[in-house]
Amino acid sequence: MKGFSCSRPGYLTGLLLLAVAPILTACTRDYTTKNEFQLTTAQQAKLKPATIEYWRDGDTPEINYASEERRKEAEQKSKENAKKEDKKEEKKTEDSQDSSSASTQVRSSKHGLRIYGIDTPEKHVSSKGDSTGDEKIEAEKASNYAEKLIPKGSTVWVWSLNTYSYDREVGALFFKSNPKQTFFQSFEVAMVEAGHAIPIAGTGLNLIADPELSADDPLSVIGLQLANAANKAYNAKINIWSHDTDGYRSLTAVYKLRGADISWTRFLDEANGYSSASAGTGASLYQLWDQRQAKLAQKGS
């Protein structure tokens, strides 16, 4: 299995600079995972705050938008009531009634969230039954990691794709390890970096090269770091990657019920054995990202 080596054979001193340039670019790329996202005002406007009720499995939490709204309402009402302590008793009663009325107007919105862009091993598939062996072990490890990373009752932010998969809303999940931090963290990046999930692209990855088309797709924000995380876990051979020295065989050992989506190869560097180049699945995310940056630079010039 190949890693991030820049010592590829056949590059002689006399090679033309034009031929060597892409290799030099690849060798100087920073593959360090940076799970810190300073979202723009427009991007933050896409986020919906919610509360984690519990985790169904490693890529599907049960969330509640309404409970988060109620929490904010309660905090605001508490502040308002604190300022009205010197008001008449009947006024306080009115406030209490108003608060009760406002709470009942908030519609319950508890449902499953299918995390966009990743897939963890399955615990159970209705048409195929429960997982066993390594698949079951990795599925449970993924769920446990998710529960520790974002415990029940935590506030999260959902970037919804406004689509549903069965009974689950589809969206990217952001969180903050510290409420005071100014940046957001991606749940998807964290799971992939820890080797508990593979990144899956679908058609969304093809939009990355066009900044205007991909503005509504969370991959336009987290895609590069998702690729860095995938390469880190892949080369470290941790968790889902640890079951065989061959990356593909390792994945097929832990994705038996669902099957391993070949789109994960598009997140790997071309130096890796199962990159999109060797798998014939199309341009890698790194190539698409370079195209994206070139278009942004051209637009800004």
Swiss-Prot record:
Q: Where is the TNase-like domain?
A: 46-243
Cellular component, GO annotation: plasma membrane
Give residues with lipid attachment (N-palmitoyl cysteine): C27
Q: What is its main location?
A: membrane
Q: Where is this region: Disordered?
A: 64-136
- Give me the residues lipidated as S-diacylglycerol cysteine: C27
Show which residues constitute the signal peptide.
Answer: 1-26
PROSITE patterns, sorted: PROKAR_LIPOPROTEIN (PS51257), TNASE_3 (PS50830)
Stated membrane topology is: Lipid-anchor
InterPro entries (UniProt xref): SNase_OB-fold_sf, Staphylococal_nuclease_OB-fold
Example GO molecular function term?
Answer: endonuclease activity
List each coiled-coil range: none
* Localisation: Cell membrane
Q: Where is the composition biased (Basic and acidic residues)?
A: 67-95, 120-136
Keyword entries, A-Z: Cell membrane, Endonuclease, Hydrolase, Lipoprotein, Membrane, Nuclease, Palmitate, Signal
Q: Which SMART domains has this protein been placed in?
A: SNc (SM00318)
Which protein is depicted?
Answer: Uncharacterized lipoprotein MG186 homolog
What is the scientific name of the source organism? Mycoplasma pneumoniae (strain ATCC 29342 / M129 / Subtype 1)
